[in-house]
Amino acid sequence: MIDRGWAIVATDYPGMGTAGRYPYLIGVGEGQATLDGLRALCQVDDAHASNRVMLWGHSQGGHATLWAAQIAADYAPDLDVVGVAALSSATDPLAVSKLIIEGPASALVNAVTSYVVVPYADEYPDLTLIGLTHPAGSVFADAAASRCATDPGTLVSLLVTLGLGGRDHLYDLDLDAGPVHDRLAQNIATAIVPAPLFLGQGVDDEVVSIDIQRTTDARVCAAGRPVETHEYPGRDHLGVIAQGSPLIDDLFV
């Protein structure tokens, strides 16, 4: 990409080794962090970066990308968003949470659930770290809040150390009604963005259901917005962006 004349910036979210709350699947926080990074890049003289930007991201990054595009006109009117690409995007945090939490219990499921519960409890006053079903649950929640959410192995090890091996769900969350449901729904990305949209996902995605992308595509088409949607049979959540994936050529053609 650099050889083709692109300048690249990767999002540095608040709370990831710096002060602030980590906005995991919290749309406005993710979107603002993404746009802040682009604005900073435009101020680096040696980068020779213009204000014409392409937004793209995978998984949580796809969610952040869509929210960045949605709020760009108001939050960063100095940026000219010319294209948006969301890959295997966690566009609907409520649907993603249901897929993960309503499945069989495991240490990894409990760890991943904490990635959502802890930031949401930090962000929203109507949510607290309640509903923990194990006496050591509060200890785990406190420890999880101080660890990098991109390191599931660390959190799984912590669960095992605490004797929370995953035979039971650590959290008791009502995803059909109430404040947890409402806050997750509040952070669904509409994907109605002011630039051409590219959606791409593996059909065999085990983390984000392909149905989420299909629903997003239908919503964007109904709104009359330009969208190019690709599905990749035989590709899972990470495989769709692996070296040799046909998505790469489709994205940069």
Regions inferred by a protein language model and the residue ranges of each:
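Accessory cap/linker subdomain of secreted extracellular hydrolases
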Residues: L87-A189
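C-terminal catalytic histidine-bearing segment of alpha/beta-hydrolase fold enzymes
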Residues: D172, D176, H181-L184, R214-V253
